Amino acid sequence: MSDRVIRIATRKSALAMWQAEYVQAKLLEAHPQLKVELVPMSTQGDRILDTPLAKIGGKGLFIKELEVAMSEGRADIAVHSMKDVPVDFPAGFGLHCICERENPYDAFVSNTYASIEELPQGAIVGTSSLRRQCQIRSARPDLTIRDLRGNVNTRLAKLDDGQYDAIILAAAGLIRLEMQDRIKTYIEPTVSLPAVGQGAVGIECRNDDAELIELLKPLNHSDTESRVKAERAMNAKLNGGCQVPIGSYAVLNGDELYLRGLVGSPDGSVLLQAEKRGNVNDALSIGVDVAEQLLEKGAGDILQALYKD
């Protein structure tokens, strides 16, 4: 155990590398005798930059290659942004650690305007997320929403070039890259409910590697795990992928878990919402309950229409 080398599969983007280096540092902090190496690689989601994510389709656009590296023995663990992680894992693999969550809110970024409310009619807002698009369109149907792909720096450069009046990014990514000064406003969940698992980092590895799973335990953050578990249970019941207009956000207050869920039509004309409070030990059933409420309101029809496209 003392001289084991752990190889971390990671995407090459600055944010993905930050996450992998964070896990590397935490592992060495917990187990100073370990050797931890990074194995950077490109994924399908990184390579296809000229198409909106929702149109590429499929689940796991940003993680499949990392899983192949583990299955071929080139890596031992994969570090993921939890909002990119599908509900189901390949046979033999599982999520064995969720690290402490960063701010899970969406961030409003603009060089001219202070908030969504301040944007003038017809202003151009950049985001590729159907979840963000449907909620912004619902709040401000007079705005023009345009797709925005690329890593954080690329997106900010497009804003600075004047292609957009504002862009919406995950606050966590900007904070981790020490770019929080670009954030004009943190968008409240009542305006834009975050994505499932947004702001949390998860670690995937083989289910049969008992020694490695034990080594990961000190990195797990139980509060974050409970919250993300509820959000993912809702998503699983809805059979949602990463690129669908689904929002889910759990808050923990003592032993009480409060989960809000949302499914919207991409044009923002329909926003279905549901919520549930319960004991944190019932995180999974709370997630399922919120999903069932949404399905009763017609969420299945919205999602089915999207999957047909």
Swiss-Prot record:
InterPro entries xrefs: HemC, Porphobilin_deaminase_cofac_BS, Porphobilin_deaminase_N, Porphobilinogen_deaminase_C, Porphobilinogen_deaminase_C_sf
GO molecular function, one term: hydroxymethylbilane synthase activity
A single GO BP: protoporphyrinogen IX biosynthetic process
Alphabetically ordered keywords of this record: Porphyrin biosynthesis, Transferase
Pathway(s) per entry: Porphyrin-containing compound metabolism; protoporphyrin-IX biosynthesis; coproporphyrinogen-III from 5-aminolevulinate: step 2/4
Cofactor entry: dipyrromethane
S-(dipyrrolylmethanemethyl)cysteine modification, residue list: C242
Role: Tetrapolymerization of the monopyrrole PBG into the hydroxymethylbilane pre-uroporphyrinogen in several discrete steps.
Quaternary organization: Monomer.
Note: The porphobilinogen subunits are added to the dipyrromethane group.
Designated name of the protein: Porphobilinogen deaminase
Organism in which the protein naturally occurs: Pseudoalteromonas atlantica (strain T6c / ATCC BAA-1087)
Source species taxonomy: Bacteria, Pseudomonadati, Pseudomonadota, Gammaproteobacteria, Alteromonadales
Gene from which this protein is expressed: hemC
